[in-house]
Amino acid sequence: MSSTEGKVICCRAAVAWEAGKPLVIEEVEVAPPQANVVRVKILYTSLCHTDVYFWEAKGQNPLFPRIYGHEAGGIVESVGEGVTDLKAGDHVLPVFTGECKECDHCKSEESNMCDLLRINTDRGVMLNDGKSRFSIKGKPIYHFVGTSTFSVYTVTHVGCLAKINPQSPLDKVCILSCGISTGLGATLNVRKPKKGSTVAVFGLGAVGLAAAEGARMAGASRIIGVDLNSNRFEEAKKFGITEFVNPKDHKKPVQEVIAELTNGGVDRSIECTGNIQAMIPAFECVHDGWGVAVLVGVPHKDAVFTTHPMNFLNERTLKGTFFGNYKPRTDIPSVVEKYMNKELEVDKFITHQLPFSQINKAFDYMLKGEGIRCIITMEE
């Protein structure tokens, strides 16, 4: 039993007091875990674009003060009543969505959209009692997607924790708890390109590069990267991108450009921007008869997807995916093992490292479009 079990822990956390304002390192109180909840010591966290999006208050009813962060790795400090498959000392990755293992979605081999623990960006409290476990001098600080990893200690539902190989380096595999797995799984689990196939990836941010990495692992012969920023092509080559298309360089629609490059269209495509102007060509550029397009990017709430019905009747398939169709507790440990077995290259996604005290610099990198992933070390 740890010396802190059952007690309130005081630790540092990066608190967002207002939308778009720099985070402030504060001393916060973290309450002990209740039933089916685990308290985790976060060792490394990363910044995902989703954190920035909601910090800017673009995607929800503004909820502040709040502790963001959802891409991280840590060690279990203590567990609440009813937690049987985790114990103090276990290495875990917190995940923004969960797996209760009891609902119809969790019991289905075809879904990872847990009824109980599916992502909820508006909820800033725990499920048990509708209250926060973070506070400063008695004033509650809100949670974010059930993880809040910008705190040295956090509490999360047991269903949102993937128990992983204790030999795996947390400062590397922490990035597998969100964006990288989303792109990787969209390719390997949903799009499933055959060896020697042609693939197009729309959007070469972290998720798109992970999708390209998945296509490389699957043995695709041509991986065409599509992005409005030509400066991304050189970096993208490290992830298997063999050709690059910038829609701004062509007078005709990009789906026509790709069709001409590939004798009628690619076998598989994946859209990772959330922009309708990319989603439509990502679907229309796949080959008739067998082409499959997968949508990963989250569109604007008022966006409308339009395409001619003949695109479907000509046997093109359009699919959507959530978190790469991975079940957090069941599947993410095996993704970590792909890294440990040298099947998956993770290190090349990590372009910056910072101490926790400089977390705002990570936001600057993201806002300027510099790098892919920045690892933040919680202990200095």
Curated annotation (Swiss-Prot):
Annotated positions binding Zn(2+) 1: C48, T50, H70, C178
Binding of an alcohol, residues: T50, H70
InterPro entries: ADH-like_C, ADH-like_N, ADH_Zn_CS, GroES-like_sf, NAD(P)-bd_dom_sf
Protein family (similarity comment): Belongs to the zinc-containing alcohol dehydrogenase family.
Cofactor binding, note field: Binds 2 Zn(2+) ions per subunit.
Gene from which the chain derives: ADH
Organism: Fragaria ananassa
Pfam families: ADH_N, ADH_zinc_N
One MF term in the entry's GO annotations: alcohol dehydrogenase (NAD+) activity
E.C. number: 1.1.1.1
Protein name per UniProt: Alcohol dehydrogenase
Subunit structure: Homodimer.
